[in-house]
Amino acid sequence: MRLTQWTDYTLRVLMYCAASDGRAQPVTITEVAESYGISRSHLTKIVQQLSAGGLLETTRGRGGGMRLMRPANEINVGEVVRAT
């Protein structure tokens, strides 16, 4: 099965957030964009979709960012792929 670029980036965002789960500060879009070499504007759209879908909790402003809304082991990859 081939994944679209959108789905690939979506999974990368979720994996990055899962790997950073124990941090005090939330993950930022800039951090993920620099880590994977993806445009910030593209990631912003993906994060908005994940937030609307109940997978990410986002906080705006200084000290803001994103976190997983539920534990990583409860997120089904198939569910994410079908939704994107």
Q: Where are the regions that the model predicts?
A:
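Short alpha-helical segments that sit at the start of domains
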Residues: 1-14
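Short helix-to-turn junction characteristic of helix-turn-helix DNA-binding domains
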Residues: 14-21
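Key DNA-contact positions within bacterial/archaeal DNA-binding proteins
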Residues: 41
